[in-house]
């Protein structure tokens, strides 16, 4: 395809880059879900509560033009105060800070046993993984859109 103006160049390149960004955002989202599964849900359980396994789904992710966004949506987590799932009968809704609790560790969930829930640094691990692979993912996505990337 011959491009004869700056406007055509930006339209053609913009579409290709936008599609590539869609692909990369989706890839990052899947990697994040896998990291949560590995670092949070596969890290063992106190047995004192039933997991909802919703931390992997409580996210809005979208690509908009030439950038993308992945945002935690605490309201997507179910709150079951009687079962102490993300809330309590005493009004301690922790959905908005659940990842801070996981990152830093927490004692309250194991108040019966006195055992501390160890920190789970899933976020740092996830960022390190993305940092190590993002260039490769972007180049591959751009190539799939027909762009030659050096």
Language-model features: locations:
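Short, Lys/Arg-rich flexible segments
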Residues: 1-77, 94-150
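Short, surface-exposed beta-strand/loop "edge" segments at domain boundaries and coil↔beta transitions
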Residues: 76-94
């Amino acid at each position: 395809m011959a491009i004869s103006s700056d406007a055509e160049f930006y339209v053609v390149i913009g579409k290709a880059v936008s599609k590539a960004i869609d692909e990369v955002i989706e890839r990052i989202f899947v990697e994040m879900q896998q990291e949560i599964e590995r670092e949070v849900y596969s890290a063992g359980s106190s047995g004192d509560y039933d997991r909802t396994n919703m931390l992997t789904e409580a996210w809005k992710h979208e690509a908009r033009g030439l950038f993308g966004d992945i945002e935690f949506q605490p309201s997507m987590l179910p709150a079951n105060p009687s079962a102490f799932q993300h809330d309590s009968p005493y009004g301690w809704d922790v959905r908005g800070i659940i990842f801070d609790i996981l990152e830093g560790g927490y004692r309250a969930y194991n108040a019966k046993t006195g055992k501390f829930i160890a920190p789970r640094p899933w976020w740092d691990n996830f960022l390190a993984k993305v940092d190590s692979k993002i260039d490769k993912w972007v180049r591959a996505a751009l190539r799939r859109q027909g762009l030659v990337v050096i």
